[in-house]
Amino acid sequence: MQLLTIGINHHTAPVALRERVAFPLEQIKPALSTFKDIFLGRTARTAPEAAILSTCNRTELYCATDDHAAREAAIHWLSEYHNIAIDELAPHVYALPQSEAVRHAFRVASGLDSMVLGETQIVGQMKDAVRTATEAGALGTYLNQLFQRTFAVAKEVRTTTEIGAQSVSMAAAAVRLAQRIFDKVSNQRVLFIGAGEMIELCATHFAAQQPRELVVANRTAERGQRLAESYNGRAIPLSELPTRMHEFDIIVSCTASTLPIIGLGAVERAVKARRHRPIFMVDLAVPRDIEPEVGKLEDVFLYTVDDLGAIVREGNASRQAAVAQAETIIETRVQNFMQWLDARSIVPVIRHMHTQADALRRAEVDKAQKMLARGDDPAAVLEALSQALTNKLIHGPTHALNRASSENRDQLIELMGGFYKHAHPSSER
């Protein structure tokens, strides 16, 4: 089995493409099923192992397969699944085989490949991806081992380096941007759309600035109310958003919607009702919650996850020593994992050798039992049994030696000498 990771992320593709390749949670299990079917319909002897990691900043497919054309097949599957032309998608896709796939998984979980260097949210997202793949019956020995090692490496990196120290989160970056637009956030009304982990982080940072009002709009009213109350705010129904948007100076949105929930027309009406007082909008969702055309309106300052990334990266340079330490740890653990993977590759060979030897043993034991049943001397039967086993067990190695070319024979002799604990002929005196 070969490991392979294909994907796109914030390094290789803009948000406009990433949102088209994203997998909503409810689509991941069916997607894994179709992916496995594609490979079983090809030359693969067994169903591939697979897991899909889909976040705001990346969509990645981790797989283990015996199909040597897996790279091309996986990229075409991703293209067809999302109805994106292969010529449009392929330039943004990375395909990482074997040790590169292992190294990438370790770096992602450790926060080295994140927009926010050292962020911890990605570990939880990877664990969710593993859980979903397990429930879909798509995980096996290879990916299970890869992800268990991945989480162990991430823990080691975070506990032995300063990779997460002094990091500037996306939430903190949103506050910094708001402070560039408004002199004081404390004078502004803030609306959060959604009630997930990212919105909660943003609410924490904005609440620290003591805004005039903090409001949450969420599809699930109870969850929105609970989040609002924890910051001394209030909740409104999501359905009221089009008619209430003009009330807010700062709007931060991050939902799991597959389509925009804030359109150009609604924002145009809000700007008009505000008499062109500026609105600061942050869209942290992928796919995006706010139609990109909104950013072209005067008096609207719209920022996406990619825009916030520039601010986040300003704080990354100071932690390069921690990055170097983390990379050293990861490289060692990659080598350890590849040793395990190499050992796994010989398991089928060993199993075949054992099966073949056992078949020979049973055949000779059957012969011996028949000889004993007809009254043959037990000592002679045992001698015949041992001779037959010896001859048949060494037939394969001796046949290989006899057929080997002169340049390969010395290597075979050395290997077999180790197997049978015999010295190499040239070492005898």
Curated annotation (Swiss-Prot):
This is Glutamyl-tRNA reductase. PANTHER family: GLUTAMYL-TRNA REDUCTASE (PTHR43013:SF1). During catalysis, the active site Cys acts as a nucleophile attacking the alpha-carbonyl group of tRNA-bound glutamate with the formation of a thioester intermediate between enzyme and glutamate, and the concomitant release of tRNA(Glu). The thioester intermediate is finally reduced by direct hydride transfer from NADPH, to form the product GSA. One of its GO terms (molecular function) is glutamyl-tRNA reductase activity. Catalyzes the NADPH-dependent reduction of glutamyl-tRNA(Glu) to glutamate 1-semialdehyde (GSA). It comes from Paraburkholderia phymatum (strain DSM 17167 / CIP 108236 / LMG 21445 / STM815). Its EC number is 1.2.1.70. Possesses an unusual extended V-shaped dimeric structure with each monomer consisting of three distinct domains arranged along a curved 'spinal' alpha-helix. The N-terminal catalytic domain specifically recognizes the glutamate moiety of the substrate. The second domain is the NADPH-binding domain, and the third C-terminal domain is responsible for dimerization. The keyword Oxidoreductase applies. Keywords: NADP, Oxidoreductase, Porphyrin biosynthesis. NCBIfam families: hemA. Belongs to the glutamyl-tRNA reductase family. InterPro entries: 4pyrrol_synth_GluRdtase, 4pyrrol_synth_GluRdtase_dimer, 4pyrrol_synth_GluRdtase_N, GluRdtase_CS, GluRdtase_dimer_dom_sf, GluRdtase_N_sf, NAD(P)-bd_dom_sf, Shikm_DH/Glu-tRNA_Rdtase. NADP(+) binds at residues 194-199. Homodimer.
